[in-house]
Amino acid sequence: MRLVTLAPAKVNLVLRVGPVRADGYHDLRTLMVPLDLGDRVDVRVSPRRGPVRCTVPGRPELDGPENLAARAAEAFRRRFGVDRAVSIRIEKRTPVTAGLGGGSSDAAAVLRCLARALRVRDGAALAALALEIGSDVPFFLGPGPAWAAGRGERLSRAEVPPLDLVLVYPADPSLAIRAGDAYRWLDEARASGSQAPRRLGRPGRWRPTLLGNDLQAPCVARKPALQALLGLLVGAGATAAIMSGSGPTVFGIFPGRGAARGAALAIQGRAKGGAAGVQVLLARTVRRHPRVSPWRSPRSASSRSTRRSSRPT
């Protein structure tokens, strides 16, 4: 069986971070929303026994067993006693290590595809498996926008209206941020007294005044160029702009699709004129994760389109 789905990127509209726990993780309260952009994940399950293979065309450094999607497939096979060969192909569109959840979303997409292909309906077991793979993975198994608590495993549905966004990802390797470093910088800032800890608060109805990210200040302190990117977004008309997750991607909220498109073009123009290498992405939040669908060849899709267009109107 061969299945395909979109592995959507996400942004954090709210990210509140509690003190470090005994297990080394932090308690979180975060509002995550999926976007209408992401990676295309193609999963083929063979009737025969065999290994897990994962390829990312054009990104050979992401091929192989260390890819989170491949690790998700291996974990699924162990948990549910499956030895059938699995082939994963990822068309990568979400920037890597960008604070947009690309790897976690790919992993969740693989779990969803395998669950459908192999008729696994134990949602609780899948959720537990997702948390073992990564803190953000359970969110991508859920129905859509959600408040997440704990490490990210306690999810509650959130109502978020469609938001038009412009994302700016700095391609400069010197601006890359590892998630572990972002949390460590926050702990150090709090220990020094330069950043006071916040109460995590309770999940509630989304409103723009909630927008915030506890990791932003310590990351900007070490990567001041991020502040310039936030300024680009506000200067282009964003009603608000923050960093997503552990960065380094920043995003702005715009009053409509047209305003967002114009801002994206303006920022791209600034980038060509000298603003350091950045990737500018236009996105909109969505209310549910994409469905898993059977794979169809481009030829069959084209023939269906031709049949539809030839019908009398």
Swiss-Prot record:
Reactions that this protein is recorded to catalyse: 4-CDP-2-C-methyl-D-erythritol + ATP = 4-CDP-2-C-methyl-D-erythritol 2-phosphate + ADP + H(+)
Keywords: ATP-binding, Isoprene biosynthesis, Kinase, Nucleotide-binding, Transferase
Start and end residues of each stretch annotated as Disordered: 289-313
Sites where the protein binds ATP: P95, V96, T97, A98, G99, L100, G101, G102, G103, S104, S105
Broad class of enzyme this protein falls into: transferase
EC number: 2.7.1.148
Active-site feature positions: K10, D136
Molecular function terms from GO: 4-(cytidine 5'-diphospho)-2-C-methyl-D-erythritol kinase activity; ATP binding
GO biological process entries: isopentenyl diphosphate biosynthetic process, methylerythritol 4-phosphate pathway; terpenoid biosynthetic process
Pathway(s) per entry: Isoprenoid biosynthesis; isopentenyl diphosphate biosynthesis via DXP pathway; isopentenyl diphosphate from 1-deoxy-D-xylulose 5-phosphate: step 3/6
Stretches with biased composition (Low complexity): 292-304
Record has Transcription as a keyword: no
Purpose of the protein: Catalyzes the phosphorylation of the position 2 hydroxy group of 4-diphosphocytidyl-2C-methyl-D-erythritol.
Family that this chain belongs to: Belongs to the GHMP kinase family. IspE subfamily.
Protein name in UniProt: 4-diphosphocytidyl-2-C-methyl-D-erythritol kinase
Species in which this protein is naturally found: Anaeromyxobacter dehalogenans (strain 2CP-1 / ATCC BAA-258)
Taxonomy of the source species: Bacteria, Pseudomonadati, Myxococcota, Myxococcia, Myxococcales
